[in-house]
Amino acid sequence: MQGFKQHTGLVVPLDAANVDTDAIIPKQFLQKVSRLGFGKHLFHDWRFLDDAGEQPNPEFVMNHARYQGASILLARENFGCGSSREHAPWALADYGIRAMIAPSFADIFYGNSINNQMVPVRLTEQEVDELFQYVQATEGAQIEVDLEALKVRANGKEYSFEIDDFRRHCLLNGLDHIGLTLQHEDKIAAFEADIPAFLR
């Protein structure tokens, strides 16, 4: 997997709190276990006026022309609450989101996002308010998320955020659970070689 060090991207402001995983990816689309193909269903019930997903909702922020191609999602508190479905971060990643900024995230969603190489950045409510004001007032507004320096930069300002060292290491080096395991492939092979034949 590709590591995440710094990313500068267009920002889409989703001005809503307590956005749950059923809103992020509705249950009718949870019919496969591949990570790919969920982006087209992201926020389906908000993005579209019909069940088939053919009539975009012109009122929904992600359908506005100025936010097309956004790779950073700005949201309010408790983003990703609700069920623990990993399809929610799959849909965001498949859509093209690389980082999310909010005052808080649901715990399981937070971990699942990191496992899918997206950076969930927690800033204070005041800092998030400042970013909303900047993004909503500035067409083409971009934000830089610097995981190496643990900084967010926007509109000439710099904001600090925290992430635990282990998760930061995994993101910087593009490691998921399988990748972490494969780092010890030689030790695993040596252990298996020592297993008595009658136990194999």
From Swiss-Prot:
Alphabetized InterPro entries for the sequence? 3-IsopropMal_deHydase_ssu (IPR004431), Aconitase/3IPM_dehydase_swvl (IPR015928), AconitaseA/IPMdHydase_ssu_swvl (IPR000573), IPMI_Swivel (IPR033940), LeuD (IPR050075)
In its UniProt record, a GO molecular function of this protein is: 3-isopropylmalate dehydratase activity
Reaction catalysed by this enzyme: (2R,3S)-3-isopropylmalate = (2S)-2-isopropylmalate
What's the short name of a Pfam family annotated to this entry? Aconitase_C
Q: Which domain of life is it from?
A: Bacteria
One cellular-component annotation, GO: 3-isopropylmalate dehydratase complex
Q: Which pathway does this polypeptide act in? A: Amino-acid biosynthesis; L-leucine biosynthesis; L-leucine from 3-methyl-2-oxobutanoate: step 2/4
| Record keywords, A-Z | Amino-acid biosynthesis, Branched-chain amino acid biosynthesis, Leucine biosynthesis, Lyase
Q: One GO biological process from the UniProt record?
A: L-leucine biosynthetic process
Lipid metabolism among keywords: no
Enzyme type, top EC level? lyase
Keyword rRNA-binding part of the UniProt annotation: no
The UniProt function text for this chain reads: Catalyzes the isomerization between 2-isopropylmalate and 3-isopropylmalate, via the formation of 2-isopropylmaleate.
Q: Which NCBIfam families match?
A: leuD, PRK01641.1
Q: How does it assemble?
A: Heterodimer of LeuC and LeuD.
Protein name as catalogued: 3-isopropylmalate dehydratase small subunit
